[in-house]
Amino acid sequence: MVMAGGTGGHVIPALSLARALQSQGVAVEWLGSPRGIENRLVPEASIVLHTIAISGLRGNGADGWLKAPLNLSRAVLQARGVIKRFKPDVVVGLGGFASGPGGLAARLSGIPLVIHEQNAVAGLTNKVLSRLATRTYAAFENAFGTRAEVIGNPVREEIAALGEQPRQVADMQGRPLRLLVVGGSLGAVALNERLPVALAALPPERRPEVRHQAGKERDIATADAYAQQAVVAEVSPFIDDMAAAYAWADLVVCRAGALTIAELAAAAKPALLVPFPFAVDDHQRVNAEVLVRAGAALCVVQAELTADYLSELLDQLLYPETLAEMAAKARQAASLNATERLAQGCLSLVKQGETA
């Protein structure tokens, strides 16, 4: 049984794992929460989804903390009911609200528990579960100290395949360079507002082609901002096919979520990273350091991201020679067998007949 929910950063790597397990003849069902993105993506993948009533603790005030023991107890009972019906041999959690009670339920039911942390700083749920888990995996060094095996993040096969031949200088000659801006499903207001002004400050002959994912209900205002600056850009609220978007791009401007970092490395894409400043424990900034240290990305904190500074950074990066060098370094930083290692870790517990 796979547990993951809330955001694509948890659900999409978990789907990669689920597909890998299914390819080896494993029956997979899913435990999530009622309002997360899993409610769309998991049924679309033809996987049975069970939901339990649970929400996060952070940001819910004193009332939320007072009700937490009762709510958690109810959710654990619901999760035990799912486990009793499905009878999984292994339960694997990749974060999200349902993973906490689901992991406790697995432990109470005597079923091996595997967890995987996608971020450089472990979340609250996984910090607790790491002390109960049969096996603990992490994408980054030091997420759990010494208690975890570091394997990287699962990445979709179609994205990993893009980086097999990192883009060369010759591939970018004879055409404008291509800039992909990705703000996530809700968009990034800072990018939406500052990219048009920053690009307008570049000489027309230095401006790249632009595809900008602006977020739900933010695409019209962003398109207007580009038009006001006389900068040509293709603006959309969502990107349904990220593999195709990465395949098109020479440079990506984006946030620094764990999934994004893993995909950029696997797809061999240079990046200008702007970590989300309100991420829990500032984990996006720590995530970004992996690609920055590798020479595959630049990182700027949002508080310093003026349009003028952004224009300077783009002017620094938008050369085929620079981008080709960064692309090669991105691929070198990729962990390409994370899905396989996580799947084999789960399957080995079944073969060994281990209990939690």
How should these model regions be labeled?
Residues 322-336:
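A short, well-ordered alpha-helix in the C-terminal region of glycosyltransferases
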